[in-house]
Amino acid sequence: MYTIKSMATKIGLQNQELTSGNPWWRNPEWHKTDKDLNAATESGIDYKSGVLNDLATGNLYILRGPRRVGKTVAIKQTIKALLEAGVPQHCIIRVSADGWTAKDLKNLVLHTTLPPIPKDSTRYWFIDEASAISGQWDSELKALRDNDPQFAADTVVITGSNSAALTEAMGVLAGRRGPGVDIDRTMLPMGFASFVSILAQTPLPPRPSIAPGELRSPRALQAFVDLIPWLDELVKLWETYLQYGGFPSSVACAKAGQPISSSFIKTIFDVIQKDAFKNSRLDVATSTAFQERLWQGMASPVNLTSIGSDVGIVKETAVRHLQYLRDAFLLWDCPKRQSGNWLPNPLAQDKIYAIDPIIARLPNLRNAQRKDIDPTVLSEMQVGMALRRRLISDLPDASWDDFIFYFTSTTRKEIDFVSHHLNGAAIEGKYIQDGGWKGEAATVDASPWDGLMVTRNIL
């Protein structure tokens, strides 16, 4: 009696994965049964970020952002749109590269069996979570763009959730990314305007696009005046936004009138503890205490020596874990502005902000005994994030340099956000309408800029 063993080569298995992962090759109705697109539809929020709109043929795009923000859904929405626009189905290839090696990436392009495409056509390659590939994957991409004429002419989109890996890849791939000018894209949790469009009970008037440099313009004032009749609803939605944030799964819970689901809280915990902190040697309790202490101090310049002392770790360990969060796109730095120019002051401590309320609130969401974040701090954080989100959208290269700062006056009073992109304006947050606000106004008045007081209500 003979036993027949199933044998499969690595490339053969890769071919199988390609056919199962690219169902549009054989089924034009693929999107009706796609689990990611169906989950997005069933969530009830119908959110399309548009982050991959207007892909130009022949470019190599890098889409960066935190895990669970919706990059995979954005890719599949883009694939559906390309097919509807008439791109032949065999010209589109998507792979999930999480757990791959650099050799797997090379084999994908050179050695797998792909369906033939029409003459003079090029392909679209969507390589999801490329930054999780082990080895010199960026060097393999460079070699493929240099030595394979077909791949060099193709449109490539790589996504990733590791800032350090993607920054290094940008350097390695310089000169091999095509002629496009908008080839670096960033996907962040949705902003307040998108949140309002999903949750508002009554339709709001059309919103003009106000650039950061126009915040004190007549157009901005008119937009403000036009929204006054909806003030009560906008205040409630801002409060909700500060609690739920902009990750699509969390927004879906807000839309349904439910607390943030325990499953999504666990997912975000895993994003931090098992992915961002995968090289950490801290136990869960200590790393959670570090996060709690870090986020509680968001409104003030960060002192890592003090934070480390408070949670029982040395400063070097605190620095390392801060970098883990930075590399995972889970926080951003707001440095102090140098006197006389738009550069960070290297001798001053930065302020650190989480990218979303669920990141900052996670220690409390997992354990109610840990402190929640004060709404005034969450509001300041989200105002800064709104400014950052818009500037990254308008100026794609800006996310790789410092362009938003805090400012300290000669009387040691702080202004929350200043930037040369604000066209002479300075932003100071004020969460509630009661109490004194003239002190904040006086701080801005004493600065070189015109003030803009940002509140949840009307003073």
Model-assigned labels for residue ranges:
Residues 71-72:
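Conserved lysine of the Walker
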Residues 118-141:
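Conserved P-loop NTPase "ATPase switch" module shared by AAA+ and STAND
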